[in-house]
């Protein structure tokens, strides 16, 4: 697990605010050793729970994690964008269209200097070697990104990146060494050209 560091200490020179927009189950956060308010929605069981790199990085910065309660109140998004997967497993979260979820992320981002959202349904589809899951996840992501890009204001930037490949080759269960795109929109458009 990750060792909680407590509240973030303000640095006199930064004054910037970041948000990790993913809303997690309380049980998952507690299994990682992170503080989370509310009752756990389910038992994690005996399986080993590992934190993603994004989770580790955000925790290291002292950020407060969002829970499914935040997703219910429109202050966070489930990892599948819409909430449909969590709802299908019995979670009390709303199901939103990708465009509505994008609007929520845009609103949340405008309250912060940096907003991060992690979508890993394509990774799970790749590990499962499921073309059906891959196509559905990519269609949902496409609708979400189209709305995000359309909703960018003149001072907004959006960077879309992946940490590795795998959904592009469903003959493998593992990550690939294929080049991954880094896309920039709005103010970020000219800043990602040099990324190789």
Q: What function would you assign to each model-found segment?
A:
Residues 155, 161, 194:
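C-terminal catalytic subdomain
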Residues 1-113, 119-125:
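His/Asp/Glu-rich, glycine-adjacent segments
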């Amino acid at each position: 697990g990750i060792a909680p560091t407590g509240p973030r200490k303000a640095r006199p020179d930064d004054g910037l605010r970041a948000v990790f927009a993913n809303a997690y189950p309380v049980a998952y956060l507690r299994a990682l050793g992170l503080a989370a308010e509310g009752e756990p929605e389910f038992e994690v069981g005996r399986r080993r729970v590992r934190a993603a790199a994004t989770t580790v990085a955000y925790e290291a910065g002292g950020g407060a994690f969002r829970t499914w309660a935040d997703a219910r109140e429109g202050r966070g998004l489930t990892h599948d964008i819409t909430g449909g997967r969590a709802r299908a497993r019995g979670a009390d979260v709303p199901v939103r269209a990708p465009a509505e979820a994008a609007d929520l992320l845009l609103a949340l981002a405008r309250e912060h200097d940096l907003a991060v959202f992690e979508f890993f349904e394509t990774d799970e589809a790749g590990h499962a070697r499921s073309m059906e899951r891959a196509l559905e996840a990519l269609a949902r992501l496409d609708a979400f990104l189209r709305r995000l890009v359309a909703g960018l204001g003149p001072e907004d930037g959006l960077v879309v990146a992946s940490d590795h490949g795998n959904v592009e080759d469903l003959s493998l269960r593992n990550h690939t060494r294929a080049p991954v795109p880094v896309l920039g929109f709005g103010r970020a458009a000219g800043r990602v050209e040099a990324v190789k």
